[in-house]
Amino acid sequence: MNKLRILLLARHATVTLAHSRTADVAAHTREADIVVCATGRARAYGPEYFSPGQTVLDVGINFDAAGNLCGDVDFGAVEPVLGPEGAITPVPRGLGGVTTSVTMAHVVQAAEAGQR
């Protein structure tokens, strides 16, 4: 997450990082254009955290009480709030493929660098 923060700041974005002791996280997330959720808590973020037109990137990989794979965001409850102008990444079949691809690219780069 730190690398993403640095990249966004380099583009003059205002970056807010929330944690477990941040007061009223929902007030911060409702005002953001882009929200990245990466807390590791199944469906912890419901519709009260979001506003129409936002882009929500759900990085969380969790299992709910029934054993189903899910993200940090309650996708079914949040997607209607975002509306047609908004977007949300699903879990599964969302950012996981990107993460795997980037990780493999780094492994290949490291292997190639080691052969030089």
Regions found by a protein language model. Give the residues of each.
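Glycine-rich phosphate/diphosphate-binding loop of Rossmann-like nucleotide-binding domains
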Residues: 1-55, 68-70, 75, 79
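Rossmann-fold NAD(P)-binding glycine/threonine-rich loop
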Residues: 57-115
